[in-house]
Amino acid sequence: MSSSTSEKNYLPEFFLACLGYFLFVSQDAIVKYIAEDYKITQIIFVNSWFALIPVILYTQTLDGWNKLKGANLKVHFFRSLTMALAVFFAYTGFYLMPMVTMYSIVFLTPLIITIGSVLFLNEVVRWKRFTAIIFGLVGALISIDPFGSKIDAYVFVALLCPLCAAASYLIVRKYGYQESIFSFIIYGKILMIIFSGIFVIFSFKTMNFNDLVLNGISGIFRGTAMILVINAARHLPGAIFGSIIYVQIFAGVLLGYLVFGEIPTINNYVGNVIIIAAGLYIVMREMKLKKNIVTSTARHPTIPIKKD
């Protein structure tokens, strides 16, 4: 009876995490739609202002302002800088490539984090997980199809997204593990506005009302998704949370088809199955070994989450 009750207790967090990741994908689709007319930096700038709305409401509701005191601003600066770059390269990739292909690239992040944890955090990753990493990289290559006729040079720009996202996570993991979630989401958004605003000064283009509304909605989606995913990560077992992240691939296929008429190729299907299998294997191995490298990552926030 207790086991059944325990499983039921995870259902709200499970569905909220799925909703959060679907909001992330919806945000990506909106960005892809409006990026035809505006610079990516301007989209990030406007998006981040609106993302502050749910973030501020969340912080106010939980009385998190006092937890901003004593924050390590150096950690926040470099973490936010690398994450701003990751978002820039992600949005650029979503605009220039099919959504499912870009998600194949985004989901290289956990694999790169695992490699980075060995190089920079002195984590021990044995041959089984390294084998999974190799399979994941092979899956990404299959999905991207670098030897096909439709390969685009922008793929190499998009590949900078998982590299920067992994760097952001590793910075936090090494130097900022004691920082509060509130300091990450508040300082992260403020610094994102500053970084993107520097470029917007020189390239701002007046948005029409409909595009401004869409960009604002994408920002609210993003801020809300961060909160949902972070809270789910704090309460769900790592194996469950680490598996949910892959719903983004399915949501990306769905929205890519419905909104943009993108039809996944056989390479996309095969490659993403391999990527998901490799990622899930790493998650399961970490749970068995009681490690916490990949299972604590949350897309975009990229924060090692502390359990309650």
What residue spans do the PLM features occupy?
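Juxtamembrane helix-entry segments on the extracytoplasmic side of multipass membrane proteins
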Residues: 9-13, 68-72, 140, 145-167, ...
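Hydrophobic/small/kink-forming positions within alpha-helical transmembrane segments
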Residues: 21-26, 56, 80, 84-88, ...
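Helix-loop interface residues and adjacent transmembrane-helix termini in multi-pass membrane transporters
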Residues: 37, 93-96, 122-124, 178, ...
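Hydrophobic transmembrane alpha-helices of multi-pass small-molecule transport proteins
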Residues: 128-145, 267-286
